[in-house]
From Swiss-Prot:
UniProt keywords, alphabetically: Membrane, Photosynthesis, Photosystem II, Reaction center, Thylakoid, Transmembrane, Transmembrane helix
Stretches that traverse the bilayer: 7-27
Topology of the protein relative to the lipid bilayer: Single-pass membrane protein
Gene Ontology CC terms, in alphabetical order: photosystem II reaction center; plasma membrane-derived thylakoid membrane
Protein name as catalogued: Photosystem II reaction center protein J
Signal peptide start-end: none
PANTHER family (UniProt xref): PHOTOSYSTEM II REACTION CENTER PROTEIN J
Subcellular location: Cellular thylakoid membrane
Coiled coil region boundaries: none
Amino acid sequence: MFAEGRIPLWVVAVIAGLGVIAVVGLFFYGAYAGLGSSL
């Protein structure tokens, strides 16, 4: 996929950041929409 042997650090940081934001967003969305029923 990349010409280099390893993935650039900024690509890993962006993917990790988006993953964390997605998990936190889904958690708060589930808590808000479920009003505690998901717990």
